């Protein structure tokens, strides 16, 4: 089935947040829930998982190039990334559901994206021992990016002002639930599930070549160095921002006059948004929320 049309592009058409399976959600990511949970993963599927605005599209594009850049180069110039790497739980206007897109993929492996927290990932991915690539981004930059994203997309609730948005992020009242639980959930899963590769957005920005090499090692790919360097260049943020097949300018739910889908792609942009008081409050809250995990982030590089 296809997602319903938006009635308008005004704030009145934005969905309401509601509690669902223990997290906050909007209907665009729950309307096809039964089919999502019953999704039949294959052993060679690769699941790309992130909290929203943590580098999903970047890593999706890298993986697409690693597997199909040479064998099917026309994909890169003619098929938008959201068709090449379906968003599994999404039911958005004017395009098939994520499950339909995933089931219709003719590629091997199938690259599939999700923002679901680890406990809501369809069981078949674990049962089939699929490779899972998780990308995490420091909370301060993540909340800034998510704020600007929610300003420009009609598939998310009205974000309100920055101060109230930051508070709701700290309270975990964001689509796909609390950032803290999301990043820690996959970090804990990694301890018992060896086919999970945990990446950091900050490491990607600092040294993309190295991170692509590590990704290849995890995937068992013997991609030549010159090929990896080429991929690093093609997937540079500025290049992707100009690329209509990766910048989401062809999807109907986003208003680029408000903000770009791919806005800055930098580390430490949070310093341009947080006041001193907000930063102190956030740090105190963060320390409490993250006190029981070994997971560490960098807020600058």
Segments predicted by a language model, with ranges:
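Acidic/polar loop patches that form or flank catalytic/metal-binding clefts of enzymes
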Residues: 74, 223-228
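PAPS-dependent sulfotransferase catalytic domain
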Residues: 1-199, 245-301
């Amino acid at each position: 089935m296809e997602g319903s049309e938006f009635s308008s592009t005004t704030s009145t058409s934005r969905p309401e947040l509601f509690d669902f399976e223990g997290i906050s959600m909007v209907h665009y990511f729950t309307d096809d829930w039964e089919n999502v949970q019953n999704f039949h993963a294959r052993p060679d599927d690769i699941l790309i998982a992130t909290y929203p605005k943590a580098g999903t599209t970047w890593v999706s594009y890298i993986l697409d190039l690693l597997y199909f850049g040479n064998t099917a180069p026309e994909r890169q110039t003619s098929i938008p990334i959201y068709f090449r790497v379906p968003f599994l739980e999404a039911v958005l206007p004017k395009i098939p559901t994520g499950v339909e897109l995933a089931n219709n993929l003719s590629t091997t492996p199938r690259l599939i994206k999700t923002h679901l927290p680890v406990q809501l990932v369809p069981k078949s991915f674990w049962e089939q021992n699929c490779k899972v690539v998780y990308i995490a981004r420091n909370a301060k930059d993540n909340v800034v990016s998510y704020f600007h994203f929610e300003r420009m997309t009609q598939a998310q609730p009205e974000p309100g002002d920055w101060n109230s948005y930051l508070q709701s992020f700290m309270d975990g009242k964001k689509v796909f639930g609390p950032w803290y639980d999301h990043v820690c959930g996959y970090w804990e899963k990694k301890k018992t599930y060896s086919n999970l590769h945990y990446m950091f957005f900050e490491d990607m920005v600092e040294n993309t070549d190295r991170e692509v090499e590590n990704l290849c090692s995890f995937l068992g790919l013997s991609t030549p160095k010159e090929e990896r360097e080429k991929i690093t260049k093609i997937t540079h943020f500025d290049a992707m921002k100009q690329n209509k097949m990766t910048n989401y300018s062809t999807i109907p739910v986003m208003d680029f006059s408000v903000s770009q889908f791919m806005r800055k792609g930098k580390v430490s942009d949070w310093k341009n948004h947080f006041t001193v008081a907000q930063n102190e409050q956030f740090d105190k809250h963060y320390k409490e929320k993250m006190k029981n995990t070994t997971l560490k982030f960098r807020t600058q590089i």
